[in-house]
Amino acid sequence: MDGSTAAIILTLIVTYIIWFVSLRRSYKGPRVWPLVGSLPALITNAHRMHDFIADNLRMCGGTYQTCIFPIPFLAKKQGHVTVTCDPKNLEHILKTRFDNYPKGPSWQSVFHDLLGDGIFNSDGDTWRFQRKTAALEFTTRTLRQAMARWVDRAIKNRLVPILESARSRAEPIDLQDVLLRLTFDNICGLTFGKDPRTLSPEFPENGFAVAFDGATEATLQRFIMPEFIWKIRKWLRLGLEDDMSRSISHVDNYLSEIINTRKLELLGQQQDESRHDDLLSRFMKKKESYSDKYLKYVALNFILAGRDTSSVAMSWFFWLVSLNPRVEEKIINEICTILIKTRDTNVSKWTDEPLTFDEIDQLVYLKAALSETLRLYPSVPEDSKFVVANDVLPDGTFVPSGSNVTYSIYSVGRMKFIWGEDCLEFKPERWLEESRDEKCNQYKFVAFNAGPRICLGKDLAYLQMKSITASILLRHRLTVAPGHRVEQKMSLTLFMKFGLKMDVHKRDLTLPVEKVVNEMRKK
């Protein structure tokens, strides 16, 4: 190497160091290293990523910025990440400047093979059209009635017998797996009117469910590697990308068969419009003519949204309730109070039929406990947006175009400046305080998203969760199996890494009923 070459290399190194030192001064949060940025900290804390993000946000006052590619021309674009949990910033991103913060090209590229241009993977006019169409369906009472039928049937014919069997055998049961199967069957029934029956005593494997899980897992794997790498793996059909191709093919064939069958059924069913009230049939009955491809993406988008989120939330709910007997007692008392009014004091008849709409609606404390669960353990703990144009967040943070903003839903519920000194306590009562101004505080609780993209199925989710949790708690007392570890799985959805093994005990309602009756007499 001659002297001039060495001088050029040395000059480049010195120039980079000066540039990097200047760059690093602008960041707070995890340490940024030359060339590799904050990746070492992210890798070291991968097993506790959500708490790691929350720790950094706590130290930085609710917002920090970091760099994962400290390379000139990339550092302030693709390599630049803004992380926030400040409700003012969330309102700005999710509502005020909604059009400036779409899903973005990277997100859409990752999910396109599975979700296409469906409602959860699209932006702009494509999203607006689908949102408007879907919103009309989610506001109908008949869809709620359809959900209630699927849920009630599953509770009575499958969930109750399976839990009773586990109790009689004195064997722990993986409640997370049970709830995943239950909600998968329910959302498939509601979406395209077919029950895959994954929740059965034998816990069978279902081809569609296995293929859907495989495609979802492969999609999530794409998030942990650079885009060009997974695209090369896809082109070469390597590893999970090859599995994903087969899984999506299976899912595609399964849904094609359902769509073709439904078309024939709808043609021969002109007089009886009520026979098919699932979402797929509702879209097919509209005046607009939708392609089979579009209908498949409609189905897959709603299955992905409705399956894992509710089951994961209920898993964390039962774990939290098992650790907080005071909360469990208040839930039981509330259920007993309502059933005494609607079904008298004959407890043996309380479990003959699932709870009705009116009974479910009166479970205010149970809903508060579910909301409190979602505050601490949101089903989707982190979400991100792409920045279209340079912007300044309400807290003064500058965000450059081409960069990404991550809003930590998990962290929002764990900040003292948002929820007070007791923010880490499981306290359903905070949702019942009369002084709580829900309109002002809606960006303090974004488990169902917020702004124009707020979850259309929020009310259906609460209906399903309240029905299932009330039915279980009315019949059984659940405790975590001895030696079982409850740990978060690092994924886009907040699964429990080792499931939720629980012992099932018979619920004795004698004392709760006596207590409620005595209190009612005093009034």
Swiss-Prot record:
Listed cofactors: heme
Q: What's the top EC group for this one? A: oxidoreductase
Question: SUPFAM superfamilies of this UniProt entry?
Answer: Cytochrome P450
Q: Give the E.C. number(s).
A: 1.14.14.1
Q: Which Gene3D superfamilies match?
A: Cytochrome P450
Give a short account of what the protein does.
Catalyzes the omega-hydroxylation of various fatty acids (FA). Acts on saturated and unsaturated fatty acids with chain lengths from C12 to C18.
What name does the UniProt record give this protein? Answer: Cytochrome P450 86A7
State the organism's lineage.
Answer: Eukaryota, Viridiplantae, Streptophyta, Embryophyta, Tracheophyta
